[in-house]
Amino acid sequence: MKRSEINTAIDNALRALERHDVKLPAYAYWTPDDWKRAGPEYSRITRNALGWACTDFGQGKFREIGITMFDVRNGNVDRPEEGTPYGEKIFVLQPGQRLPYHFHWKKTEDIISYHGGTLMIQLFNANPDETMNETTPGHVYCDGVRREFTAGQVFEIPHGSSLTITPKLYHRFWAKEGGDVLVGGEISTISVPKTDNRFGGNARRFVPIEEDEPKRHLLNIDYPQLHETV
């Protein structure tokens, strides 16, 4: 991805959040210079990779396949004494923008619709070899209510509602085409994106960044560079 795409995506996300009166922690609005001035009391934020994330999953077409997220809370599997025993994200999707098919080996998550556009979620079971099973039915829970699904079924999630994704359940979600920008969220067990994503095809969570313009916002993957030029 280009840094210019990331800057614009976060600017757009902040506008969408402001429009729906969704507030984030103060450091969500910091500049790189603000981060340079941050003291050691902020080290838990950087260690646990809280803050902004933005990816096109290596597909090179962010407007179609991508997401902008802010990790509000998370724990640390290597340091169980700190952080929280759960994760929370706020995400923003443009109309028609989607994530690629993927599952998690360990994480259970509620995907929640909050404001704006309509959240759409598609589900498939996984085969024992971790490929997608395109024939078998299954079941999930929406706000605690059991729902059966056929392979590839799409659920439309109204505002205030959620769908629970369990391990090894292939899913992708998006903001319904022709609608508004979607503000959604995720509440989950501790999130470990570096090791707990299994994507279909050639998609990947972390992608190289082309620094075509200065950073306006730091991503959580930028934190190791805080003592370098940002």
Describe the function of each predicted region.
Residues 94, 151-178, 184-189:
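Conserved metal-binding segment of the jelly-roll/cupin
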Residues 101, 122, 173-174, 195:
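Short helix/loop capping segments that flank catalytic or ligand/cofactor-binding pockets
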Residues 89-91, 109-113, 120, 154-155, ...:
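His/acidic/aromatic-lined binding-pocket segments of jelly-roll/cupin-type domains
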Residues 78-87, 98-110, 114-115:
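A short beta-loop-beta micro-motif enriched in histidine and acidic residues
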Residues 2, 128-148, 174-230:
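Double-stranded beta-helix
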Residues 1-87, 216-222:
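A short, N-terminal "cap"/entry segment at the start of jelly-roll beta-barrel domains
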